[in-house]
Amino acid sequence: FLNELRNQGYYDEALVYLKDMEASPIAPVTFKDIVTYERAKTLLASLAVVRERVKLESILDSAEQSLDLFITEHRTHPLMGEATELFANLLIKRAELNQEQVDDEGVAEGIKQSLLADSRKQLKKANEIFGNVREDIKQKILRIDSKTTDPQLKTMLGEYRVRYMQVRLNLPQTTLLLAGTYPEGAPEREKLLTEAVDEFTGVRKAYQAFQGTFFLATLGLAEGYAKKGNIDDALLY
């Protein structure tokens, strides 16, 4: 029910439902344990229909509070990995808002540099999280026999593989954003762009059969080459 509300864009109704379930004496304890996680997930999903910067920042603040609470109180919960991924996505959104402000006319140079510094910090943390999650999921995949016939294990393996694919794509996407916080010609920018191009190339090679992932990796690769100034290579994609 909750997922359907989110999928249909009824974010306010989903938040009310979560509040009611949190207060309900008959709601399962297992669900109450993840209310803060689900609230953060709903708030972040709602950003897709919000345009005002002040409201966006308010929603991000609320989502971060909920995530902090879940992560602090449920460090061994099975959803801990997903929660940290959500936190990484939250950091990326904050960095993107900073970048939008940097691009606004009339913003003082000192403020621009401060915003860019904040963005770098947020994106570096997001990349660190994605890197840790990637290794964690990889180990979980390796612990399951790829030829298992156990239905539950097969389901888990499939879910892990999908998450692993997504995180592999998240990493170069975040690296590309991080590169954009440095001026053209800066050594840090060139190094990050090279890393992003290499990672996107690896994702394209590994997931040729997955059209959505392959397409996004191709777009990222073309953008990476373009930002490096390799227009001919960018046009190949």
Describe the residue ranges of each PLM region.
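Single-residue signature of alpha-solenoid repeat helices
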Residues: 14, 56-59, 63, 112, ...
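"A position-specific structural signal for the A-helix of alpha-solenoid helical repeats
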Residues: 1, 38, 42-45, 86, ...
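Short N-terminal segments immediately surrounding and downstream of signal-peptide cleavage
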Residues: 1-8
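N-terminal, post-signal-peptide region of Sec/Tat-exported proteins
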Residues: 10-48
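Mid-chain, structured segments of secreted extracytoplasmic proteins
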Residues: 33-72
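Short solvent-exposed coil/turn linkers within tandem alpha-helical repeat scaffolds
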Residues: 8, 21-34, 67-86, 97, ...
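Residue at a conserved register position within TPR or TPR-like alpha-solenoid repeats
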Residues: 5, 43, 50, 91, ...
